[in-house]
């Protein structure tokens, strides 16, 4: 069953965050992730406004978690820490 990686981000250091994004993209796609939304237009209806919103589809919740915990993604994430304020949730899709 598919799962989604949903991130809401405020970037505080664009240069460092760009390094994260470049490395993270490779790690995410290597784990079967497919970007569905990435910093496009959005409407903030409730909660905290974060200008960068990302949705990635993975083959399963386990694949999404494996990606997050992978050495490749953690190396990328080191560039995002201190360069952004982030909320990230992994959520399984409904059965078809």
Predicted regions, residues:
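Short S/T/G/P-rich N-terminal loop/turn motif that feeds into the first structured element of a domain
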Residues: 1-52, 59-69, 92-96
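C-terminal structural segments of small proteins and small subunits
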Residues: 64-90
């Amino acid at each position: 069953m598919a799962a989604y990686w949903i991130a809401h981000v405020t970037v505080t250091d664009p240069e460092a965050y760009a390094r994260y994004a470049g490395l993270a993209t490779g790690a995410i796609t290597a784990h079967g992730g497919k970007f569905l939304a990435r910093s496009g237009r959005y409407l903030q209806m409730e909660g905290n406004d974060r200008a960068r919103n990302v949705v990635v589809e993975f083959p399963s919740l386990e694949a999404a978690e494996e990606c997050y915990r992978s050495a490749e993604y953690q190396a990328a994430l080191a560039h995002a820490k201190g360069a952004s304020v982030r909320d990230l949730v992994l959520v399984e899709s409904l059965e078809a």
